[in-house]
Curated annotation (Swiss-Prot):
GO terms for cellular component: cell outer membrane. It is a lipid-anchor. Residues 1-17 form the signal peptide. Keywords: Cell outer membrane, Lipoprotein, Membrane, Palmitate, Signal. Belongs to the SusD family. It is found in: Cell outer membrane. It comes from Formosa agariphila (strain DSM 15362 / KCTC 12365 / LMG 23005 / KMM 3901 / M-2Alg 35-1). This is SusD-like protein P2. Induction: By ulvan and rhamnose. A lipid is attached at C18 (N-palmitoyl cysteine). Pfam families: SusD-like_3 (PF14322), SusD_RagB (PF07980).
């Protein structure tokens, strides 16, 4: 769905933030005056999708936070804003500007979804049809809370339509376990009612809900259920119109992604759209090479740049490295130069390979790659295979099925490179050996796709990956503090029921 049709009326249904929730007007139209048809219900849900695509959520603030918090992307341009450095260096406080931007935007997504869910009963239409549309709202709510709970732990959990901010002025935090219960319930509803396929990957399907259930169960350590949900998707590839794309590069080409079969869910951008922050994508900009004149949309900003060790430790024969990282740039005179000379062409660049997944083929885009036409893929079929592999190995050490799923991804990588690398893994491995291989495969296959921090957190890898021998040593990392972000300080000032903040903040 390349364009979200958001009317002023729909935007008025959105209530954002948390304690005072920076209320947008909600009383212009009563719900019973708006929600009359399934088209009205869909229009309201489209408000959630639009809120996902804003600069303050997927367009930069949330995604850049996830990139920098992991060990695959470091700060490049040292003159970039302090709030980004704080996220990267584990020195952030409760006044961090990244968090204060995506926190209220997340609750805007949730608020719009709640309006749709609460008012679906007003629609006079076939119940099955209404439920199938409403299931999208359940998915949007679960998707957003799944990000929040992993980042913050205990959070306010609002699952009802808010018509007056006073209803939640004194809301308290909900324990993490209860938030997960709500997420699972929403995804189960979505899995039951969503169709097998949609006309666009920007709309969730039954397989999307199952894939996220698998991810949630894996995060919770329920390996049996994680395997069941992942294999439900895998065993029904044809039914759900899924496959691994033959060419890994096509997953990160804005001109290709709309027709791909691998994505289970996408967040779409139109290109050169910048009205009120909706549809604004800056991920290409912040990851692109400063001083590079290769693309007509201009140079990047060299903000989030992998450490040199990320490039050096990555098997040079693995096609995924060539797709994931740019090692050359082009001067204004047309000269192609290597990453070792990036700083010669811009004082703000750094002599390290840059993330290529978003900047290389940004499609129709504004200056510096802003406002690209990229379809970002929060969940794709490759990850489902990796979830199944990890869960099956935990259930049955060295599972041959787990090995086969990993090898499917390696085979795809070999097709791209035309070489024998990466080699297949063999059966008969010990559980720890296969576990380490699968986690490494996740790191490589899903590099820079906003997953790595969540893996570091759930596996408690912080001391290892941020230690002296890690890809990105971070001496400030504190395992007692840094697996959670701080709740925004102003929210706690306005509502003391949200106190105390997370430990260490």
């Amino acid at each position: 769905m390349k364009k979200y049709k958001i009317t002023f009326i729909v935007l008025l249904l959105t209530l954002v933030g948390c304690s005072d929730l920076e209320e947008n007007p909600v009383g212009i139209l009563a719900p019973e005056s708006f929600f009359k048809t399934t088209a009205d219900l869909q229009a309201a849900i489209n408000g959630s999708y639009a809120s996902m695509s804003t600069e303050s959520f997927w367009g930069r603030k949330l995604t850049l936070t996830l990139l920098l918090r992991g060990d695959l992307a470091d700060i490049g341009d040292q003159g970039t804003s302090g709030r980004r450095k704080e996220v990267n260096n584990f020195t952030m406080g409760d006044d961090n500007g990244m968090v204060s931007a995506f926190w209220p935007q997340a609750y805007a997504i949730i608020g719009t979804a709640n309006q749709a869910i609460s008012n679906a009963g007003l629609i006079n239409d076939d119940e099955n049809k209404v439920n199938a549309v409403a299931a999208q709202a359940y998915f949007c709510r679960a998707f957003t809370y799944y990000h929040l709970v992993r980042l913050f732990g205990d959070i306010p959990y609002i699952d009802f339509a808010v018509s007056d901010a006073s209803e939640i002025d004194a809301i308290s935090k909900t324990p993490e376990n209860e938030v997960y219960e709500g997420i699972i319930a929403d995804l189960q509803y979505a899995k039951e009612w969503l169709p097998d396929t949609q006309f666009s990957r920007a709309l969730p399907s039954k397989a999307t809900a199952a894939a996220y259930l698998a991810s949630v169960y894996l995060t919770r350590g329920d390996f049996q259920k994680a395997a069941e949900e992942a294999q439900f998707v895998i065993n029904n590839e044809a039914r759900f119109d899924l496959r691994l794309e033959p060419d890994f590069q096509n997953l990160f080409d804005a001109n290709q992604t709309a027709g791909l079969k691998e994505p289970l869910f996408t967040i779409d951008y139109m290109g050169q759209i910048s009205s009120s922050g909706y549809g604004q994508d800056y991920v290409a900009s912040v990851t692109g090479i400063r001083g590079d004149a290769t693309h007509e949309y201009g140079e990047g900003w060299s903000v989030a740049v992998p450490s040199l060790k990320v490039y050096q430790d990555w098997d040079a024969k693995d096609y995924r490295r060539a797709v994931s990282l740019d090692t050359t740039a082009t001067s204004k005179s047309g000269e192609v130069y290597p990453y070792t000379q990036f700083e010669e062409y811009s004082d703000l660049a750094v002599n390290r390979p840059h993330i290529a997944k978003y900047y290389r083929y940004a499609g129709l885009a504004g200056n510096n790659g802003r406002e690209s036409s990229t379809n970002y893929i929060p969940m794709r079929y490759a990850e489902v295979l990796l979830i199944a592999a990890e869960a099956l190995n935990e259930i049955s050490a060295g599972s041959s099925e787990a090995v086969s799923y990993v090898n499917r991804l390696r085979e795809r990588a070999r097709l791209g490179s035309g070489s024998m690398h990466p080699l297949n893994i063999s059966e008969g491995l010990l559980q720890d050996e296969l576990r380490n291989i699968i986690i490494e495969e996740r790191k490589i296959e899903l590099a820079f796709e906003f997953k790595r921090w969540y893996d570091i957190k759930r596996l408690k890898l912080g001391n290892e990956v941020f230690g002296p021998n890690g890809l990105e040593p971070q001496p400030n990392f504190d395992a007692n503090r840094d697996y959670l972000l701080p709740l925004p300080g102003p929210e706690l000032v306005r509502n003391s029921n949200l106190m105390p903040n997370n430990p260490g903040y």
